[in-house]
């Protein structure tokens, strides 16, 4: 039947394969295959075509419903780096992702200049993407103009029915194309593996399950090509903007989309670098929201805290152990009978909770609580009564849909209804008057439902069953019925995958309105563009060594999806962790963008101070994280303005190194901080891959690896240590470790200058108050400083300069750089000393040299610590360090 994967096209291995592929694409397809092009109108960058069902017969796979007989295709080069191709019913409107979810140009706005009989190729001198339509049978290709590399090459067997759409694109031979993305799933590898099906239907399935559809839907992939006509490391992106359920089948030499509704709305992003792809992608879907500075600290949570005294004991335990604790969280335990916007009057009464939160705030700490979408059906519950009065709940069969979640019977707000967002905002504001929480965690928003609603009509059980839960369960399983009706008559069938996005947006906007400060929202369910409003965590993982590794894969995937504030439950959520696993997990988790310890009720407690070995690891790893806070926050600025992930795969910085394409046991923070964690029990070493260049330890600043080509190195990994290195060519801004970020921000600044092999280095620093709603906006105060370093006079002189790009944040004018660490110095002979000049004036700075012993480079001088400086961050400076002989 047509629902099966098509036979993959020939793999282009040699002239015979090319010839056979040409025959395949030129074959006279019968009535059961695809469409023909009836007419074309176009200009050089816009095209419109009418497609008609081939042969006039009954079409393909009649068991899936009748084919739509006439289709409309629009293609437009919307920017120099973005191509939009949309295929829909020519005669009847169909559901599409709403404009207010992803604001985007209408295809019609690009088609005014088209003319009948226009060309069948879109190509401009400024765009690297070329679109070509082939007429009989219909198919289309997307090509990189600069190299001729075919990026997307559809086969002629397009299927378009009311509730089943299928399209296949061939791919280069396995080994040339490396694909990443298509989530949300827990995957064993970051790079997608062939012969796998990626199902997109938001579901409450624990993240400890591998290869199943989880909480979010992101029909986007990045393709990085190696060798061939495209050149090494050229990347592009493909988005199918569709909120309906789907299976995406990656067969190695092809990718097939099987979608149960909506339209085929494709966007192609030219890259060619991986960073350029995410820049172009987030230009369309929206830039990631700026996160408050404090959210980059360490967070502690547990499902199962018993009362306020339990919370107080945890906070005290961290303080006594001298382990940073930025944010305390509570799960649903704090609620009165699990009802949103309430406090348990016995265990978490307001007269105990308010002083507890006030004490956190006085100590520079924050408090976050969970809320769920289900509103308990209870006429004595004010939130329910107000929701009923405003008529904002999801409908089914003419009435409010009745589900069951933690508080029992519930109704669910319909966030497509404008009144629902207003209702939500008022409830949040009223709750914050009782308890001034600093952020909100929105959970169970797939929507999760403890009962399976029976099918009401055909859309509850469509003719094609996607691979829901890995066993093709009905789409109503553990959620609300697909036949439920949203505001405006929208079926849940179409809007299901949007619920988490819409709730996160409403929560973000409510916090912004109530506090006037930058919101912090953590959402379990996400969709394309959710990063504009929310952070995400990987969900209910398991306390296993496998999940420790898999957390890196999910973290890197969400960086591609435009949600850079991402992390996993440290030490594992489900099941009992072990001391060794927890120790190694905090070593990794300290470098997640979002770093939180969280565990399930009934499992062994795992606060980081409970085992001394874990506490040692936590102090060491979190101590380094807190020193790196200025760097992490600057990466947040980069993410907010360009879409760049905070945590990145190695190929983002080294796209020409094919060895990096399969690496998912290490990752980069930004462009040059490499984290190489231990991921197996009993290990005392770790084998890490180092791309070409110089790599310095971030613990003692010594040169650890110097290589002209990438190589694997076995490193010591003592029980309390995670290997973290910085690549030569980077300048990092550090501050002094403390137990809260507010204390860190008051400390002196250090510059780490890691010189590349050519003696140069660069870096950036972004500063603001960490909580203004805008980050680098016209109404906010902020400073941006660029640093550069270079050796002169054969290496005997090192110059470090700053350039103030923007300076309206007053504290930058008083922040002092007290030390500059120069890493990677070389000298033919040891110098007698150093002379230090600031802005041309010699200063009385102290200089110490060390770290040359055991260096992998000849002539290595090691590390020079230049202390006693008083350089002002917000004022440009020119620091010159001269070796004297």
Swiss-Prot record:
Glycans are attached at residues 195, 378, 397, 467, 477, 576, 844. The keyword Glycosyltransferase does not apply. It catalyses: Hydrolysis of terminal, non-reducing (1->4)-linked alpha-D-glucose residues with release of alpha-D-glucose. The active site is at residues 443, 446, 540. GO terms for biological process: polysaccharide catabolic process. Gene3D superfamilies: Glycosidases, glycosyl hydrolase (family 31), Golgi alpha-mannosidase II. Residues 1-33 form the signal peptide. The keyword GTP-binding does not apply. GO terms for molecular function: alpha-1,4-glucosidase activity; carbohydrate binding; hydrolase activity, hydrolyzing O-glycosyl compounds. Its EC number is 3.2.1.20. CDD domains: GH31_MGAM_SI_GAA, GH31_N. InterPro entries: Gal_mutarotase_sf_dom, Glyco_hydro_31_AS, Glyco_hydro_31_C, Glyco_hydro_31_CS, Glyco_hydro_31_N_dom, Glyco_hydro_31_TIM, Glyco_hydro_b, Glycoside_hydrolase_SF. Transmembrane segments: none annotated. It comes from the Eukaryota. Keywords: Glycoprotein, Glycosidase, Hydrolase, Signal. It is an enzyme of class 3 (hydrolase). Belongs to the glycosyl hydrolase 31 family. PANTHER family: ALPHA-GLUCOSIDASE, P-TYPE DOMAIN-CONTAINING PROTEIN. This is Probable alpha-glucosidase Os06g0675700. It comes from Oryza sativa subsp. japonica (Rice). The lineage of its organism: Eukaryota, Viridiplantae, Streptophyta, Embryophyta, Tracheophyta.
């Amino acid at each position: 039947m047509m629902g099966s994967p098509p036979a993959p096209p020939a793999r282009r291995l040699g002239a015979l394969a090319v010839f056979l592929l040409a025959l395949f694409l030129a074959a006279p397809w019968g009535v059961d295959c695809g469409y023909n092009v009836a007419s074309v109108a176009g200009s050089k960058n816009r095209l419109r075509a009418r497609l008609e069902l081939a042969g006039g017969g009954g079409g393909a796979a009649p068991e899936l419903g009748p084919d739509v007989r006439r289709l409309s295709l629009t293609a437009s080069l919307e920017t120099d780096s973005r191509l939009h191709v949309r295929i829909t019913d020519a005669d009847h409107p169909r559901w599409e992702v709403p404009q207010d979810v992803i604001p985007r140009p209408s295809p019609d706005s690009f088609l005014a200049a088209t003319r009948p009989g226009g060309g069948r190729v879109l190509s401009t001198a400024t765009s690297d993407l070329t679109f070509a339509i082939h007429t009989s049978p219909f198919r289309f290709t997307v090509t990189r103009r600069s190299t001729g590399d075919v990026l997307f090459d559809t086969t002629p067997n397009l299927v378009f029915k009311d509730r089943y759409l299928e399209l296949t694109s061939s791919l280069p031979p396995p080994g040339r194309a490396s694909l990443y993305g298509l989530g949300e799933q827990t995957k064993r590898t970051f790079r997608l593996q062939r012969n796998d099906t990626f199902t997109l239907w938001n579901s409450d399935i624990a993240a400890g399950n591998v290869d199943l559809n989880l909480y979010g839907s992101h029909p986007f992939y990045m393709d990085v090509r190696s060798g061939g006509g495209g050149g090494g490391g050229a990347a592009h992106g493909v988005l199918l903007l569709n909120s309906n359920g789907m299976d995406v089948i990656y067969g190695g030499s092809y990718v097939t989309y099987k979608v149960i509704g909506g339209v085929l709305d494709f966007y192609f992003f030219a890259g060619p670098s991986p960073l350029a792809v995410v820049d172009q992608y987030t230009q369309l879907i929206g830039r990631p929201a700026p996160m408050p500075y404090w959210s980059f600290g360490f967070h502690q949570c547990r499902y199962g805290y018993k009362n306020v005294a339990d919370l107080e004991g945890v906070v005290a335990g961290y303080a006594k152990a001298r382990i940073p604790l930025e944010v305390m969280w509570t799960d649903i335990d704090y609620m009165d009978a699990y009802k949103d916007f309430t406090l348990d009057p016995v265990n978490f009464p307001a007269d105990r909770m308010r002083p507890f939160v006030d004490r956190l705030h006085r100590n520079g700490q924050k408090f976050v609580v969970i809320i769920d979408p289900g509103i308990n059906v209870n006429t004595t519950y004010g939130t329910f009564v107000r929701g009923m009065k405003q008529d904002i709940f999801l409908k089914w069969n003419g009435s409010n849909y009745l589900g069951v979640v933690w508080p029992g019977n519930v109704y669910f707000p319909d966030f497509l209804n404008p009144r629902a967002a207003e209702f939500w905002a008022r409830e949040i504001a009223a709750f914050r008057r009782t308890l001034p929480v600093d952020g909100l965690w929105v959970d169970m928003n797939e929507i999760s439902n403890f009962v399976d609603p029976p099918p009401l009509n055909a859309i509850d059980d469509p003719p094609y069953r996607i691979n829901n839960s890995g066993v093709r369960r009905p789409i109503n399983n553990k959620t609300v019925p697909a036949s439920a009706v949203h505001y405006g008559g929208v079926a849940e069938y179409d809007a299901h995958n949007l619920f988490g996005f819409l709730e996160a947006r409403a929560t973000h906007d409510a916090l912004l309105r109530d506090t006037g400060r930058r919101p912090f929202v953590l959402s379990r369910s996400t969709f394309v563009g959710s990063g504009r409003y929310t952070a995400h965590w990987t969900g209910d993982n398991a306390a296993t060594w496998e999940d420790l590794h898999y957390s890196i894969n999910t973290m890197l995937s969400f960086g591609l999806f435009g949600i850079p504030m991402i992390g996993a439950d440290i030490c594992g959520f489900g099941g009992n962790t072990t001391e060794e696993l927890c120790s190694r997990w905090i070593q990794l988790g300290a470098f997640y963008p979002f770093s939180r310890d969280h565990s399930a009720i009934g499992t062994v407690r795992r606060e980081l101070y409970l085992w001394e070995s874990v506490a040692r690891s936590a102090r060491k790893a979190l101590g380094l994280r807190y020193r790196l806070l200025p760097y992490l926050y600057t990466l947040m600025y980069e993410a907010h303005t360009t879409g760049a992930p905070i945590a990145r795969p190695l190929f983002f910085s080294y796209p020409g190194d094919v060895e990096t394409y399969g690496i998912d046991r290490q990752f980069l923070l930004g462009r040059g901080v490499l984290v190489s964690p231990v991921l197996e029990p009993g290990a005392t070493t770790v084998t890490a891959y180092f791309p070409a260049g110089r790599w310095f330890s971030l613990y003692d600043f010594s040169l650890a690896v110097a290589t002209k080509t990438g190589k694997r190195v076995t490193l010591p990994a003592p029980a309390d240590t995670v290997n973290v290195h910085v690549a030569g060519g980077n300048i990092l801004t550090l501050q002094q470790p403390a137990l809260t970020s507010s204390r860190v921000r008051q400390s002196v600044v250090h510059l780490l200058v890691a010189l590349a092999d050519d003696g140069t280095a660069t870096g950036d620093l972004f500063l603001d108050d960490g909580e203004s709603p805008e980050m680098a906006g016209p109404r906010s105060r902020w400073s941006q400083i660029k640093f550069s370093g270079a050796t002169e006079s054969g290496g005997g002189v090192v110059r470090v300069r700053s350039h103030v790009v923007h300076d309206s944040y007053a504290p930058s004018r008083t922040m002092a750089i007290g030390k500059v660490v120069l890493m990677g110095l070389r000298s033919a002979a040891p110098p007698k000393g150093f002379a230090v000049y600031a802005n041309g004036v010699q200063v009385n700075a102290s200089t110490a040299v060390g770290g040359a012993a055991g260096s992998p480079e000849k002539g290595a001088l090691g590390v020079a610590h230049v202390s006693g400086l008083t350089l002002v961050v917000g004022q440009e400076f020119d620091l010159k360090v001269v070796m004297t002989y």
